Amino acid sequence: MRLAAATLVPLFLLGFLELGLRVVGYGYSTRLFLPLQIAGENFLVPNEKFTYRFFPPGLARAPLSSPMAAIKPKGTYRIFLLGESAAYGDPDPSFGVGRYLEALLEVRYPTSDFEVVCVAITAINSHVILPIAKECAKHDGDMWVIYMGNNEMVGPYGAGTVFSEKAPSLEFVRSVLALKTTRLGQLMDQVITGLHGNSATPESWGGIAMFSKNQLSYDDPNRLRAYENFRGNLDDILRVGKGAGVPVILSTVACNLRDSSPFASLHPTNLTSKRLEEWQRLFQAGNDLEVSGSFQAALDIYAEAAAIDADFSELQFRIGSCQLALNDNARALESLERARDNDALSVRADTRINKIIMDAIHKNTGSSVTGVDAAQLISDQSPNGIPGKELFYEHVHFTMAGNYLLARILAEKVAERLPALITAGGGERPAEEESTACNRRLAVTLWDQKRVWDVALGRISGAPFTAQSSHARNLQYCKARMQEVDSRTTPSSPAHDDQMYKSALEAEPNDSLLRWNYAQFFERTGRLSEAVKQGELICERLPHASWPHYFVGSVMARLGKTTEAADYFQRALRITPDFPQASKELERIRRRNFSPAQGTK
């Protein structure tokens, strides 16, 4: 009796505290999807606080805002796309691989309705994707596509992360995450963070520059443990998919090998100062020869440096670049892969990550899992067999051409698992016809092409990209691409772009990403009233998202409609209370409308 009381009383108290915290509204839901009625229809919308379990709130990344019908419409084939920022479509998800995949499938099978739901999120890794998979299993998916692996070292609980403990055991990670699903656990997390803090955690988002101080050697014990955690998470993700009876397309991960030099390189700790000095002398001599175009002579000197330390990643990149210049493509590929694998700032899926993925594919042969070696297939279709700047804006994020190529690769495997009822109604069309149709569906305007290259240019103009030896040529390439778009732009281009948006929206009026691009087009070209109109339509479609409300408010303010602008800023803040830009704009309007001498205007 006493034992029962000793057990039940604390449990009762904990349950009472948990209930009390929920009643007063403390904490956040850890579900990926939340129910919401939009225009009288039931939808599931992404929870902007879903990643609070994995990131400090100020650094948390949000999923795409697009709503999904709570009950899948009859005749719809729903595909969940799982992954990180590369699958998300960074730097612009409106032209991401999921968007191209959906467009391509609808071109090939016009009698069917496809819905590719992108549940990929920037900066996450397999520790986050496993809970996402468990949620997707509840929502009537017909297929999953998994493209993940770039963030295993720097994402939550990775070996080089700034968000949490570094590479703890899977048991520890899952226990902590389970505890944070409770309001008590969230309260404990807040108290502990408040008491101890973490000076290593940035106050604001800084991209991959945040991880620059957490460099990892090739055989760092934390790095090795992170690989095993990835293996365990991947096995469980596939197990969840099998349990849901969903066919899964699992892909290896490609990256920029040719034109993205390592971000950081490390020498072994046991290298003597004398040997290091000799290595540095040889490296500089090789560099001088390489710059002068004497590639074979440079290779000979680099080989001497490699005899001292072959694992310095920048050295392998220089060796690979010289081999490529000499048309020794096979050896160049090996060297450039080794450069990536030894990069001390590990933000690209490396050989060991892709081997774990291939192991999982082979292990599940004959099951509901279908493998695709996208990394190899992308190499096969790249100049000299080595992926580079033609397909990637920087280290891992695809250009529009890269996303389209990956979508074509994935579509081949998707087609193998589609029901005969769908495949009987269509099939692959001529490549040029498919490309044109996809670009028309997504409204790939000249204005958007230049806009996204401009975003990429801004990104690589900051750390850690500026420290790359490949930086100057990548900067030049971005500028050249923007100039190339300019060369195709004529006085009639804005009208043509406008019509392209209109036609695409007539076909897909509920496409919020497409309408968002249209709103930006109007705003940037000075057609502010039309920008407001498109923004208001987005707000109606996405009442749960703060960013369209902020956009409408900011354009209203430029039109001098301060009352309406303030209303939209307030709406944005009701949705996302911690929205500093909206708070700042609202305060600016209040100051403008109030003078101590005159009172309220």
What are these regions (language model features)?
Residues 329-344, 566-580, 587:
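TPR/TPR-like (Sel1-like) alpha-helical repeat modules
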Residues 306, 340, 505, 539-540, ...:
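A conserved position within tetratricopeptide repeats
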Residues 149-359, 374-389, 412, 416-510, ...:
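Serine-dependent acyl-ester chemistry module
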Residues 291, 325, 524, 558, ...:
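Register position in tetratricopeptide repeats
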Residues 4-19:
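Hydrophobic membrane-insertion alpha-helices, especially the h-region
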